[in-house]
Amino acid sequence: VTITSGTPAVLGFTPDRRQEAGKQFVDVGIAEEHAVALASGIAANGGKPVYGVYSTFIQRSYDQLSQDLCINNNPAVLLVFWGTLSGMNDVTHLCFFDIPLISNIPNMVYLAPTCKEEYLAMLEWSIHQNEHPVAIRVPATDVISCGEPVESDYSNLNRYKVAHRGSKVAILALGSFFGLGQSVLSLLKEKANIDATLINPRYITGVDSELMDELKADHELVITLEDGVLDGGFGEKIARYYGATDMKVLNYGAKKEFVDRYDIQELLRANHLTDEQIVDCLLYTSPSPRDISGS
């Protein structure tokens, strides 16, 4: 059953498609709370609900996410659209607070695909599994297709994917910011001959402790990139994990603030989220260039 809350176009449900779907499609109106409660109830009774919602509106349903869905561990699927700094830019419709909101509720599995193929594979898995409520942060902006094989089973939770194995610096590039991670990887090689490790975390809700421990052997610096607010976000989980170790961790994301009618390029620069700014920060702040380049 497909569910929307006043925004059927978020899932491409035109009037013709809604007519064709019949009772398999439900729009509850501007009532996100009811949509999540409905999805939870359907899942509890063996159905396969998929609720599509814009990031900016999911905040209205926090009580139902926690009390109805996650406490009961009902395997409904939530598709969170436009969870990105590049989404709607007026102060009442900001789209970058969903990671702290959703990912810190117990039992929830929040996934961050990096491309079309990964998104569709995660969606297929989430519909057929029966163990967890699953939310998927649908890739936004210029994320289209990777053209590479992706995994089909995500049951082994919190296992990150190493996209490129290097040393000294590890880049954890979450979801829509994976492309930024690729740019940082290339620029580090070009500017300082540093062959960094690039990681696709995939899971927003947990830490791959085995991989994080492996990095200690030949890495001095871990950076996280997330297309959202830093406070309560993904990067803080990684920083906390390494808190009692010698590993240096730098988190890149947006400052916790209300911004209105902003220019996205200006916002990215203000938060040091361009590849040039990130690489300059890595090379000219602690640890020193000598530490991470070995020169």
Q: Where are the regions a protein language model picked out?
A:
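Single conserved hydrophobic/aromatic residue that forms the stacking wall/gate
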Residues: Y284-S295
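Secondary-structure boundary/capping residues
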Residues: N74, L111, M247-K248, G294
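Thiamine diphosphate
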Residues: V1-V134, D142, Q277, ...
